[in-house]
């Protein structure tokens, strides 16, 4: 017997549906996969029998499972079930919308938000820094990037920004077009303040000694706005 990948998928779906049906008969609450498999397998079988139309099966698919037949939260996870079923006159897509009515219980992962605004970084002291893009390409800086180590074509007082990041919402960014100059608000990086990666100017605990080393590195590597003491002495192995 030679089967196409599509036929193998349908056999697997039928097997999963039968397993789900047996568990339902035993009173076992179905999970997401089992619920979808049971509905899909039933529709395939009824379509193959040829006694019901696609429209009738769409309605029937909403009566197969009740909220108490599935685990808490499963009903809200299944917004629709779509299955390509073989009818006597050809293959048709049967889509069952909201196959299981919600039972009013809490949905796993559901968020309840307050109506008022949320103040980000509340209580953290911010400093304002004027930044200019002296390069010929746009530069975009993410919310948690160590601002001291941003693109070397951004000109600003780098010493003032050591150990700081943008005071903006997580996941957002600030963009500087070529020649653009504007001020940004920065706050201290939280946590244990061990800064690694970025442009490898720090790669250690962010303290005063690290700042001296980082400023020297930045000046050597051509980062605009980096001013290092000409009498710099390597007191710590870099």
Swiss-Prot record:
Enzyme Commission designation: 3.5.1.5
GO cellular component terms given for this protein: urease complex
Key word Metal-binding present: no
Pathway named in the protein's UniProt entry: Nitrogen metabolism; urea degradation; CO(2) and NH(3) from urea (urease route): step 1/1
Ranges for region Urease gamma: 1-102
Keyword Hydrolase: yes
Reaction(s) catalysed (UniProt annotation): urea + 2 H2O + H(+) = hydrogencarbonate + 2 NH4(+)
GO molecular function: nickel cation binding; urease activity
Residue span of region Urease beta: 103-238
Pfam families, alphabetized: Urease_beta (PF00699), Urease_gamma (PF00547)
Subunit and partners: Heterohexamer of 3 UreA (alpha) and 3 UreB (beta) subunits. Four heterohexamers assemble to form a 16 nm dodecameric complex.
Protein name: Urease subunit alpha
Organism, scientific name: Helicobacter pylori (strain J99 / ATCC 700824) (Campylobacter pylori J99)
Source species taxonomy: Bacteria, Pseudomonadati, Campylobacterota, Epsilonproteobacteria, Campylobacterales
């Amino acid at each position: 017997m030679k089967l196409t990948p599509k036929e193998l998928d349908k056999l697997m779906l039928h097997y999963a549906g039968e397993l789900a049906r047996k568990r339902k008969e035993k009173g076992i609450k179905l999970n997401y996969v089992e619920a979808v498999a049971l509905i899909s397998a039933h529709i395939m079988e009824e379509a193959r029998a040829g006694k019901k139309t696609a429209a009738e099966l769409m309605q029937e698919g909403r009566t197969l499972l009740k909220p108490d037949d599935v685990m808490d939260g499963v009903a809200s996870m299944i917004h629709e079930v779509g299955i390509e079923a073989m009818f006597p006159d050809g293959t048709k897509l049967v889509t069952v919308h909201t196959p299981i009515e919600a039972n009013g219980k809490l949905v796993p992962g559901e968020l309840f938000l307050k109506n008022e605004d949320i103040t980000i970084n509340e209580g953290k002291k911010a400093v304002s820094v004027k930044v200019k893009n002296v390069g010929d390409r746009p530069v975009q800086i993410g919310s948690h990037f160590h601002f001291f180590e941003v693109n070397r074509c951004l000109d600003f007082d780098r010493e003032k920004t050591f150990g700081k990041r943008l005071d903006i919402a997580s996941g957002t960014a600030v963009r500087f077009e070529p020649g653009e100059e504007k001020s940004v608000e920065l706050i201290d990086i939280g946590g244990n303040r061990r800064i690694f990666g970025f442009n490898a100017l720090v790669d250690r605990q962010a303290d005063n000694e690290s700042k001296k080393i980082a400023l020297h590195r930045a000046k050597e590597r051509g980062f605009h706005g980096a001013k290092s003491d000409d009498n710099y002495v390597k007191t710590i192995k870099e």
